[in-house]
Amino acid sequence: MTRCAPFSILLLAANLVSAQALVVLPGTDDPNALHFNERFIARNHVASIVGQQLIKRDNRPMQEQKEKYLYRFDEQGRTIYSNNSFGQPGSGRDTASVIYTYNDQGQVTRRLRNDLAGHFAYTIERDSAGRTVRETYTRIENLGTDRYTLVPGATTEISDEHYTYTTVNDTTWRKRYLNNLNLPYREQTFVSDRRGYLLHIEDRYVITERRSRTTFSYDQNGRLAERVEQPDMDRPRKLRNLWHYDAAGNVISGELWHDERQVNQLEYLYEESSMLLKARLTKDMETGQINVVRYHTTLR
């Protein structure tokens, strides 16, 4: 007979998950990219977050940089707009902005990117399980005179990727990449344990047989603690990311190692009363330079 956990414990667990401003996820994405917790953003009525870049060099005062980051969220806590800019927004020096569109299941179906090269759209088609089966990358002509306001004109297709999925067994599945001849050229194999934790991803290019492998380890609370990437399995070089958390589950520090050499050290700071993200610090272990992004949150 299986005993149900007391409601108070379930409620505490749910609150701890919601209390985390950031989540660290296993997968193929950039491990150091910010992933905002949608439940936290929605519950705390966060409308936007602005980040200001600063640099601290040895024996020199902190210097504010022109680079800024902007994230906007809908009422469900989803990121609907992001921007990375130099100087004031609208000055013409913005490096990139992205508008996100979601389906009824809360999954991204389109990313509209605007940078100095123009407007580009990533359109994603999904199957009934929510998996990406097609991703089309197009350039959209802007008939308007304002770079930031798209008046759609001609569309030029740049790439059209298709994917298929195969279930190998209860804990293993495979993703295949198809080229324009509908032939597989790459495959990724995902292996989890029986509890659902992703253990490793093996990436193989069919023609060259080049393989890479990424493994994941977790702490006693099921949070991602280590990510080890071997970009080429014929060579011993490895990239290792480590993460540490506080009692509430907030990520508070991270490390990046290239083999036995530590490359950088990350720290995350939060507001004590609200647990809103306050700053992220990245120290280059070779030069000693510290890059700081200081965050300001606007509520609805």
Model regions and ranges:
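Buried hydrophobic residues that stabilize the cores of well-folded domains
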Residues: 20-300
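N-terminal signal peptide c-region/cleavage motif recognized by signal peptidases
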Residues: 14-18
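Bacterial N-terminal signal peptides that target proteins for export
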Residues: 1-7
